[in-house]
C-alpha cells in the first residue's frame, strides 16, 4: 500500500474547496468539474506557478462526498452557528471550507480530528484573515464533537 504524503492531501483539500466553490457559483455538473480539475488544475502549472501534486482519490472523495451529503452537512453546520446566523449569510468560500471540513469529520475516520481541523484552518488562511480562520477552527471543533 502506498503512503500518501500530507502535502498531497493538503493540496487535495485546497483544490476541493476551489472545486466546491466553482460548483456553487457556476452550477457546473459534477462530472465536468472533476474532469476539469483532473485535466487542468491538480498539480498543474498556472501563471508560472506550479501547484503541488494532489491526492486525486482524496480530492474526488471530498468533492463527491460534499455533493452527496450536502443537506446533512448543512444541517450540522447550521446547528452550530450562533443565534441569528444562517448558512446563506456566510461568505461562499467560507461555506465551502466548512462543508469540506465537516464532510471529512463525518466520513473520513481514517484522518484524526486535529488534522482535519488544522488543515481546513490552513485553507482558511489562504483566503481570509486570522479571525475567520479561528471561526473555522471553532465551528469544525463543534461539528467534530457532534460526529465523532
UniProtKB/Swiss-Prot annotation:
The membrane-spanning stretches of this chain are none
A GO CC term? Answer: cytosol
What keywords are assigned to this protein? RNA-binding, Transcription, Transcription antitermination, Transcription regulation
Keyword set includes Manganese? no
Coiled coil (UniProt feature): none
**Does the keyword RNA-binding feature in the UniProt annotation?**
yes
Q: A Pfam family in this protein?
A: NusB
List the InterPro entries.
NusB-like_sf, NusB_fam, NusB_RsmB_TIM44
Q: State one molecular function term (GO).
A: RNA binding
Q: Which Gene3D superfamilies does the record associate with it?
A: NusB-like
Q: Which GO terms describe its biological process?
A: DNA-templated transcription termination; transcription antitermination
Q: What does this protein do?
A: Involved in transcription antitermination. Required for transcription of ribosomal RNA (rRNA) genes. Binds specifically to the boxA antiterminator sequence of the ribosomal RNA (rrn) operons.
Q: Which family does it belong to?
A: Belongs to the NusB family.
Q: What is this protein called?
A: Transcription antitermination protein NusB
What species is given as this protein's source? Novosphingobium aromaticivorans (strain ATCC 700278 / DSM 12444 / CCUG 56034 / CIP 105152 / NBRC 16084 / F199)
Amino acid at each position: 500500500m502506498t503512503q500518501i504524503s500530507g502535502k498531497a492531501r493538503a493540496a487535495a483539500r485546497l483544490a476541493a474547496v476551489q472545486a466546491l466553490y466553482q460548483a456553487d457559483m457556476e452550477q457546473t455538473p459534477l462530472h465536468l468539474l472533476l474532469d476539469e480539475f483532473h485535466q487542468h488544475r491538480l498539480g498543474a502549472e498556472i501563471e508560472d506557478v506550479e501547484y503541488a501534486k494532489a491526492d486525486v482519490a482524496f480530492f474526488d472523495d471530498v468533492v463527491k462526498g460534499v455533493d452527496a451529503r450536502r443537506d446533512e452537512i448543512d444541517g450540522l453546520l447550521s446547528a452550530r452557528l450562533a443565534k441569528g446566523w444562517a448558512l446563506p449569510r456566510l461568505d461562499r468560500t467560507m461555506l465551502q471550507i466548512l462543508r469540506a471540513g465537516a464532510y471529512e469529520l463525518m466520513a473520513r475516520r481514517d484522518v484524526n480530528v486535529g488534522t482535519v481541523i488544522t488543515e481546513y484552518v490552513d485553507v482558511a488562511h489562504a483566503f481570509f484573515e486570522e479571525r475567520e480562520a479561528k471561526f473555522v477552527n471553532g465551528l469544525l471543533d463543534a461539528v467534530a464533537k457532534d460526529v465523532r
